[in-house]
Amino acid sequence: MLYIRTGKPGHGKTLNTIKEVDQKAHAEGRTVYFHNINGLQPEQLKASWYKFDDPEKWFELPNDSVIVVDEAQGWFGGRDPRARPPEHITRFETMRHSGHEVHLITQDPRYLDVHLRRLCNGHVHYWRVFKSQQLLRFVSEAVIEKVEVKSSFKDADKKTIRLDKKYFGVYTSTQGQHHFQAKMPTKFIMAMLVISAAVYMSY
């Protein structure tokens, strides 16, 4: 099974991928192999997590293992459509025979090879609400390419979740913990001030 997980920087895609994969792998008794998750502390997680070196050799990992690659476009990025897909891409065509479950994390699905987008079993997108602790989590069986357009998710399953602070220290976010602190947009604050002033002047 291939899952693509997307979201803008600071929208919790890596944090929530770690949380969700860890809980599922632990419940199923599966081992997780990860690449490019900076400063990950496996001892703080429930499942067994191991670092591996070459994402292009993902298919050589033990059968039935779970695989997570952050900033996956570095190894599974787009290519000239006239070129033949390399082995580490075509191997996804028959991955069900080995029981691998792969999670590719990137900011935008269009950063990934079109071959993978067509083979994807599930697309999870995270959308942070007003830079707060609240997120919208969208899930679709097919890849939704225009992730910058909110209406693109009208047919996706939607769930509201919150950033879990317990996972802030599990890995080193390139954004830093301060990036996850709530911050209301300036336009929203100004609008509230105008409304408050109007109410005050009406008395």
Question: What do these predicted regions represent?
Answer:
Residues 1-167:
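Cytosolic/nucleoplasmic/matrix-facing N-terminal domains/tails
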Residues 169-203:
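C-terminal single-pass membrane-anchor helix
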